[in-house]
Amino acid sequence: MLLSLSAANVFAQSSLIATLSHEGEITAFYGADALKEAHEAAAHGDAITLSSGTFSATDITKAITLRGAGMQVYTINNVLPTLINGDFTIQIAEGVSEKLTIEGICHLDRISSNCKLSGARFIKSRLGRVSLAYFANASFLHCKIIEYMYLEHSDCIFNNCYVADCRPTNSSSQFYNCILVDDGDGIGLKDLEYASLYNCILIGKESSSGDRLPSSCVVYNCTGVNCYDATCFKDVPIALNVEQSIFTDTFKDYTGIYSDDITFELTDKAKKWLGTDGTQQGIYGGNFPYDPTTSNPHITKCNVAAKSTADGKLSVDIEVAGVE
């Protein structure tokens, strides 16, 4: 494969780097705007890989695969996270056959979209505020959505995710082995219209009478924690094998206040509350037990020489860590 270098921002020390893979050729871009520059040069179906570090956000108008080094704020196998700073939109033209995939990023600002997009995937990413409209067959795997999730005229599947304040409007959502949270700001469990929940743990606000799921939901093998009147399932017509619990009986390290280092591991008692498939409820059960480690190799270091050699060559040292 060929490697070409964008010389706009090269440094003697370790650099931010985005690599663009297009038809077998790899192009590297450097600096905080590397993601923006790589996206401008990309075509539908291309892949952009980001190193650890903080990149400026850019609107996504192409169905690309965007991969980061990971979402965690602490190190995973000595790999720091990839952070994207600033709001961005997803506006991909209708009818594009390629699919959008976003994996291994930390983005705490707002992602919004109202384009008709099918098959988008969000994997192993920590997201702040997400607002999607007209998304079909979108999927979220091993994600943490820590502020809110708005869905309008969309259908999405969530596997082994933490989702705060989810509000689907004219949407159909399926949640498998997820943790869903009502943080008490007026949006929460009562807004989960037409949702199907399997093997999930629902966190309510004890002081709020709005913690009950709407009657349009179907619920299988789920547990409600800290819910008003001891039940969030009261109005649900189909609610099979549901439990009620409190924080200390359910989680080892979570008491209702989110922080990045909380594992959401269950207590020994809670591990006995099995889902429909015989595994534990929550994010560590099911067919896809939660694991924040990304599936792609990580760019862990990029050193670029300050000067070229006498024959015009520029020394570039890129270190890539494979998945263990």
Where are each of the predicted segments found?
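Acidic Gly/Asp/Thr-rich repetitive segments characteristic of extracellular carbohydrate-active
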Residues: 18-56
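N-terminal extracellular ligand-recognition/capping segment immediately after the signal peptide
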Residues: 44-65, 69-75
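Short, compositionally biased P/S/T/A/G/V-rich stretches that sit at domain boundaries
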Residues: 279-314, 321
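Bacterial Sec-dependent N-terminal signal peptides
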Residues: 1-16
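Predominantly extracellular beta-rich ligand-binding scaffolds that present long acidic/polar faces
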Residues: 102, 108-114, 127-260
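Right-handed parallel beta-helix/beta-spiral solenoid domain characteristic of secreted/periplasmic
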Residues: 65-113, 126
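C-terminal accessory segments
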Residues: 238-293
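Acidic glycine-/aspartate-rich tracts in secreted/extracellular proteins
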Residues: 53-54, 69-73, 224, 228-229, ...
